[in-house]
């Protein structure tokens, strides 16, 4: 959310564009990210989006088959939506890229992106064991970064989106399992200094035939969540309240 307007994007494919919509779900504007001479911007597999006062950060981090060597986060200026740059990264312990035989059960896919303190954080979507690994990225560095897992959480599901509220010290994630059940996962008192506290709440979301991919914290009991159109239902935005 930027200036009371929701900002979203397509998943993989299509134009590298941002879409702006209101509370009624009406698209009120769109902005194609210009391909500048130095930065080639593509929607390889955009998965999540977050922002601070100066920049929007777009996670081009989708890696279903573990064969991407061009994972990156795109930095977009909030004042004019011009491209500031890209933060390229790779995973330290990934030795195989499965170019010839795509592999679906691996931990080098990531769909959740959020800001915490002065870092960008991403959480893996691990089909091999249904855990999630937390990685931290220096948002000021322009050099390629090699990421190493800071901690692993046994969420027993596949993480598809995340948001962090620093005032509430609350991390909110959405996920699903192989049966199609959707979950809200809440880490309270979540800070970089206490990542080892692995306590979280996992709440089943009573929505069927939807692929929930994004979440925004309103307060510690209320959240916006959105689903995408993947052939199993229409895209929707829901306001979710928990007790």
Predicted regions and their residues:
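Sequence/structural signature of beta-propeller domains
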Residues: 1-243
């Amino acid at each position: 959310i930027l200036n009371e307007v929701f900002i979203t994007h397509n998943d993989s494919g299509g134009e590298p564009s941002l879409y702006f919509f209101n509370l009624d779900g009406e698209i009120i504007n769109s902005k194609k990210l210009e391909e500048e001479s130095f930065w080639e911007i593509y929607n390889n597999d955009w998965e999540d989006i977050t922002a601070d006062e100066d920049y929007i950060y777009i996670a081009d981090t989708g890696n279903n088959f573990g064969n991407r060597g061009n994972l990156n986060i795109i930095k977009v200026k909030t004042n004019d939506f011009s491209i500031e740059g890209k933060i390229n990264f790779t995973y330290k312990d990934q030795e195989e890229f499965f170019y010839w035989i795509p592999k679906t059960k691996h931990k080098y896919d990531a769909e959740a992106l959020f800001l915490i303190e002065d870092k960008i954080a991403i959480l893996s979507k691990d089909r091999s064991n249904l855990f999630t690994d937390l990685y931290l990225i220096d948002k000021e560095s322009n050099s390629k970064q090699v990421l190493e897992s800071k901690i692993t959480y046994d969420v027993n599901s596949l993480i598809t989106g995340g948001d962090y509220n620093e005032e509430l010290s609350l991390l909110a994630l959405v996920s699903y399992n192989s049966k199609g059940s959707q979950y809200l996962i809440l880490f309270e008192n979540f800070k970089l200094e206490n990542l080892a506290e692995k306590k979280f709440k996992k709440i089943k979301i009573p929505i069927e035939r939807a692929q929930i991919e994004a979440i925004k914290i309103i307060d510690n009991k209320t959240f916006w969540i959105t689903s995408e159109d993947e052939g199993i239902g229409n895209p929707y935005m829901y306001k979710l309240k928990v007790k």
